Amino acid sequence: MTIAAGRFTKEENDLFDIMDDWLRRDRFVFVGWSGLLLFPCAYFALGGWFTGTTFVTSWYTHGLASSYLEGCNFLTAAVSTPANSLAHSLLLLWGPEAQGDFTRWCQLGGLWTFVALHGAFGLIGFMLRQFELARSVQLRPYNAIAFSAPIAVFVSVFLIYPLGQSGWFFAPSFGVAAIFRFILFFQGFHNWTLNPFHMMGVAGVLGAALLCAIHGATVENTLFEDGDGANTFRAFNPTQAEETYSMVTANRFWSQIFGVAFSNKRWLHFFMLFVPVTGLWMSALGVVGLALNLRAYDFVSQEIRAAEDPEFETFYTKNILLNEGIRAWMAAQDQPHENLIFPEEVLPRGNAL
């Protein structure tokens, strides 16, 4: 019985061992088990985006031209979201909407769901790749944990937000100008810039940029000299094995500048990890809140006083009026299927209109 069990286990492991050996072999481009998810999904997501921006119109879903074929450029081309009438359909090529007709599938916006879902799984595959490689070379998994932040933002903006709304139609289209339009939409309909989660996201991203600049400059400033060259690249050997800069000197410098400084490298680098990752996580949470139509700060007392007193105005009340203008223009332009008609007196006016 023992011999039979042993033989069974050996046969079971043979195929797995062969695949494991091939997938995790040391090569120029590591594949790994995560690569089985990453590479196909990344290939399909990028391929779908290039196909859509090159050939596919958004006339049937948004009433827009969105491809190079129609005269768009890199900044104005996009893979647009499906029509609002299609709600949250996965828009499978073989589904009831397209019924296997590739042209019809593209016209309906099927490429958007294709790119969004493959893109999400591709990003997850890339995070798993970092986990897998870290385990292989016996590193801690903080790279993968950090990469969870942009994944959280992508999933919240492109998937969770439209799931909370009436359909994929309200997600961002995949294009530069399309993303800008989505940002304006977020401001006009959700007052996103006054949302505390957005504030935390901005603080995280800009704070991380500041930390990165300070850290890079400090390390360059405190490098040990090991050459006679006149500049950084000639004077320092990029392959020296020992410590290359002085933490003690850096600590003394910033202690004199600010009165406080990081005392060790672990705390310093953890802080550089913590600031941007937490900021992105918080902004992702904020977008989940917007999916449920949770409101940002409302200073109603200022709105009431501004309505009663023509001479009283704050930056907040001015922004509220701007948001109303955005909504009045965008609702009719953005949602032609609703046949929204606003009286002329409620539309904002300006020199360009």
UniProtKB/Swiss-Prot annotation:
<keyword id="KW-1133">Transmembrane helix</keyword>
<comment type="function">
    <text>Photosystem II (PSII) is a light-driven water:plastoquinone oxidoreductase that uses light energy to abstract electrons from H(2)O, generating O(2) and a proton gradient subsequently used for ATP formation. It consists of a core antenna complex that captures photons, and an electron transfer chain that converts photonic excitation into a charge separation. The D1/D2 (PsbA/PsbD) reaction center heterodimer binds P680, the primary electron donor of PSII as well as several subsequent electron acceptors. D2 is needed for assembly of a stable PSII complex.</text>
</comment>
<keyword id="KW-0604">Photosystem II</keyword>
<dbReference type="InterPro" id="IPR055266">
    <property type="entry name" value="D1/D2"/>
</dbReference>
<feature type="binding site">
    <location>
        <position position="215"/>
    </location>
    <ligand>
        <name>Fe cation</name>
    </ligand>
</feature>
<feature type="binding site">
    <location>
        <position position="130"/>
    </location>
    <ligand>
        <name>pheophytin a</name>
    </ligand>
</feature>
<comment type="subunit">
    <text>PSII is composed of 1 copy each of membrane proteins PsbA, PsbB, PsbC, PsbD, PsbE, PsbF, PsbH, PsbI, PsbJ, PsbK, PsbL, PsbM, PsbT, PsbX, PsbY, PsbZ, Psb30/Ycf12, at least 3 peripheral proteins of the oxygen-evolving complex and a large number of cofactors. It forms dimeric complexes.</text>
</comment>
<dbReference type="InterPro" id="IPR055265">
    <property type="entry name" value="Photo_RC_L/M_CS"/>
</dbReference>
<dbReference type="GO" id="GO:0009535">
    <property type="term" value="C:chloroplast thylakoid membrane"/>
</dbReference>
<dbReference type="GO" id="GO:0009772">
    <property type="term" value="P:photosynthetic electron transport in photosystem II"/>
</dbReference>
<dbReference type="Pfam" id="PF00124">
    <property type="entry name" value="Photo_RC"/>
</dbReference>
<dbReference type="InterPro" id="IPR000484">
    <property type="entry name" value="Photo_RC_L/M"/>
</dbReference>
<dbReference type="GO" id="GO:0005506">
    <property type="term" value="F:iron ion binding"/>
</dbReference>
<feature type="binding site" description="axial binding residue">
    <location>
        <position position="118"/>
    </location>
    <ligand>
        <name>chlorophyll a ChlzD2</name>
    </ligand>
</feature>
<feature type="transmembrane region" description="Helical">
    <location>
        <begin position="153"/>
        <end position="166"/>
    </location>
</feature>
<dbReference type="GO" id="GO:0045156">
    <property type="term" value="F:electron transporter, transferring electrons within the cyclic electron transport pathway of photosynthesis activity"/>
</dbReference>
<keyword id="KW-0812">Transmembrane</keyword>
<keyword id="KW-0150">Chloroplast</keyword>
<feature type="binding site">
    <location>
        <position position="262"/>
    </location>
    <ligand>
        <name>a plastoquinone</name>
    </ligand>
</feature>
<dbReference type="GO" id="GO:0016168">
    <property type="term" value="F:chlorophyll binding"/>
</dbReference>
<feature type="transmembrane region" description="Helical">
    <location>
        <begin position="279"/>
        <end position="295"/>
    </location>
</feature>
<keyword id="KW-0560">Oxidoreductase</keyword>
<keyword id="KW-0934">Plastid</keyword>
<keyword id="KW-0249">Electron transport</keyword>
<keyword id="KW-0148">Chlorophyll</keyword>
<keyword id="KW-0460">Magnesium</keyword>
<keyword id="KW-0157">Chromophore</keyword>
<comment type="similarity">
    <text>Belongs to the reaction center PufL/M/PsbA/D family.</text>
</comment>
<feature type="binding site">
    <location>
        <position position="269"/>
    </location>
    <ligand>
        <name>Fe cation</name>
    </ligand>
</feature>
<feature type="transmembrane region" description="Helical">
    <location>
        <begin position="41"/>
        <end position="61"/>
    </location>
</feature>
<keyword id="KW-0597">Phosphoprotein</keyword>
<keyword id="KW-0408">Iron</keyword>
<feature type="modified residue" description="N-acetylthreonine">
    <location>
        <position position="2"/>
    </location>
</feature>
<feature type="modified residue" description="Phosphothreonine">
    <location>
        <position position="2"/>
    </location>
</feature>
<keyword id="KW-0007">Acetylation</keyword>
<keyword id="KW-0602">Photosynthesis</keyword>
<keyword id="KW-0479">Metal-binding</keyword>
<feature type="transmembrane region" description="Helical">
    <location>
        <begin position="125"/>
        <end position="141"/>
    </location>
</feature>
<dbReference type="InterPro" id="IPR005868">
    <property type="entry name" value="PSII_PsbD/D2"/>
</dbReference>
<feature type="binding site" description="axial binding residue">
    <location>
        <position position="198"/>
    </location>
    <ligand>
        <name>chlorophyll a PD2</name>
    </ligand>
</feature>
<feature type="binding site">
    <location>
        <position position="215"/>
    </location>
    <ligand>
        <name>a plastoquinone</name>
    </ligand>
</feature>
<protein>
    <recommendedName>
        <fullName>Photosystem II D2 protein</fullName>
        <ecNumber>1.10.3.9</ecNumber>
    </recommendedName>
</protein>
